[in-house]
Amino acid sequence: MTDTVSGTSGTSGAPGASDPSDAPGAVRPPADPGAGGFTEALAEATAVASLAPSSHNCQPWALARLTGERARAAARLFAGTGNRTGPAGDGTETLALAMDRTRTIGALAAHDVEMRVSCGAYWQLLLSALAAQGWHPEGIEYPATDGEGRRLAGDRWPKSWSLLGVARVRRTGDGDGSLRRLRETAAARRTNRGPYGASGIGTDVLAELTGPSAGAAAGAPVAVTHLRGETERRAFGNFVARHGGRDFSHDAAWRETFAYLRPNASAAALRGDGFTLEQLFGPMSAARHHLLRTALAPRTMRVLRFAGYPGLLASQLAAIVRRTPAVTVMHFLADEPSGADMVRAGARLADYWLRATHAGLALHPVSVVVQHDDVRAALAERFGLRGRVFFVARLGHPTAQFPATPRHREAAAHLRL
């Protein structure tokens, strides 16, 4: 049984609604309590948004608060672009979303899409947390190209930042009391790679996950397909068995992935990004940890691939996939989505993941099937998916807890311009 739901707009059912640190003007929570209203609300919102998911836990987002002439420049820049999703207005605060290329991955062409999707997830959490405090978007706009940041802030715009979007928010009242729930749900969200329970997921629950969204996710040009039937899940498992070893046999991609694999939790916390073997495979003995880390090292992998090791890892992943009660597939409505589409898709993904977390469900992305062009095309053809696929994950009730991933100290920062 396959269920597909296309993107819609409306009121969100998601919880809560919906390296600039050394640069002059960098701001981090907690906010100055004497600064008043929006500064405090923004500090709360960035703390929540910093918990957004990202590929390799690289946290590629960046945020600027535009003031004075720079805020007016933003209004002029996007006037008449056709990328507007709301009216302009006075008395608003202006925020600029950017991608910091010093914290992105890029070994594969598809990684650029993943980075924009990751930034979109952050954007949605940020706007949802602001809305929960009474600050609602009056307009969200997206530039036609990445190079518009300097038109907003001139030389003050960081060279490594690519502008992805601008939002104007206005306080329309007090918070609705949902901030705490949003914060707790965002903190509870995990990538859980362990086994899931055998019990199915009801159609009513899936309908909740794919319900209308607000904020940056409103009307996102995205469809969600759930592979639920035994035949479909077995077919997807077979697909993973056939293609799941690609990352391990791709030198550049695997070197980049391994570079984010931290030796232990302390090292991960110190770096503030990446992941540990325990976050990939669950708890393990010191001996198994050493063996796995040695086997996964790029130099070792180049030898082991001739012995079929990537295929063995793919078959192990496929076995877990076949026992999963549902597989979530998110795909654009277009074959060639725009940069704005990618950011909005990330916002939609954030809503979906938070709703799943609130429902007691877990997600485990199976990214290898979307990161290589030929594999992604074969996936779409095999399962009749229209538009470019950008996210595939196991969905189910977790049977084991996985630790949270660390956060970079700049993940909750913003730059005031």
Q: Where are each of the predicted segments found?
A:
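Acidic, surface-exposed loops and disordered segments
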Residues: 1-12, 18-417
